[in-house]
Amino acid sequence: ANSPGVIFLGGLASDMEGTKAKYLENWAKDSGNSFIRFDYTGHGESSGNFSEGSIASWFQDALSVLDELTTGKQILVGSSMGGWIALLLAKHKPERVHSLIGIAAAPDFTEDYMWNSFDDKQRQKIMEEGFIYQESEYSEEPYKISKNLIIHSREHLVLREKLIFSCPVRLLQGTDDNDVPVEVATRLLDHLESPDAKLEVVKGADHSFSTESCLELISLQINQLMKK
């Protein structure tokens, strides 16, 4: 297969059957590039309990995929939480990362958008009982937010200091994203020190970033990065 390969990192509670993952797999087949999509522990086809997971464990899953299933440099394409995990991979394994694309990347969301939005009663409940439930617009079932997710993700917050990368970074973000506001993307851009970092804001795109034009934009970015 052509080098570099591409690894797709999905979002929280998503699975590798999502629109973006399947689209990129087809793109890779057509272009002759190696491509990997996978499920984190407790997601999709993978074993394990979702509520026992955190950024710490899902980052380890991604690290295992990078180390054991790929060779050479990789383009990391991270959606939502996967954008946070892609940043961690680039930070810990810079020699293996060709470039990084964040799609509605959600670094530090467990702290900035979950914990910081909880009132005292919710914080007390999650600490004492181990979890709370929060409505989700993506499924009828509410999200189960665990104490594990909050506590163990704190070891891996990335927006508390500068992120120094030598690889190119592309951030794609929609204006109609109800989960990750555009400010998160601009804040991430501010924290990045990379010789080649760009943010593209797409008017009208939502958090799923899965319309035909959004998908084409993702593959266009990959094709441009391949030439670097």
Q: What annotation goes with each model-predicted range?
A:
Residues 3-11:
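Short beta-strand element of the alpha/beta-hydrolase
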Residues 96-201, 206-228:
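The alpha/beta-hydrolase serine catalytic core
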Residues 83-94, 100:
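Short glycine-enriched nucleophile-adjacent loop
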Residues 69-80:
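Alpha/beta-hydrolase fold nucleophile elbow
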Residues 25-47:
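Conserved alpha/beta-hydrolase
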